[in-house]
Amino acid sequence: MKYEWDDTKKWSNFEKHGVDFCDAVFFNWQHALIIEDARNDYAEDRFNAFAPINNRLYVMTYTLRDDVIRVISLRKANKREVNYYVSNFQNLNAN
């Protein structure tokens, strides 16, 4: 997969969450739970993906531009998000 991001946003994300967008290459898409981010009327479709990086759950907000994933945010999942992921990912695999 190809990734891109705004460098200013990359640094503000690191300051806020302590996570570098470069870590997106380790995002485990095979175990990803993806939902559309419809909270606001964005200029393009946005998605929130929950997946592990090195045995820790992360949340990536991104948009697709052709065959490139444009990272908007990447951070460690909080406890509520971990619980959401566990319950929903298990339900997906049960079907």
Question: Which positions does each model-derived feature cover?
Answer:
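Ribonuclease/tRNase effector modules and their secretory precursors
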Residues: 1-95
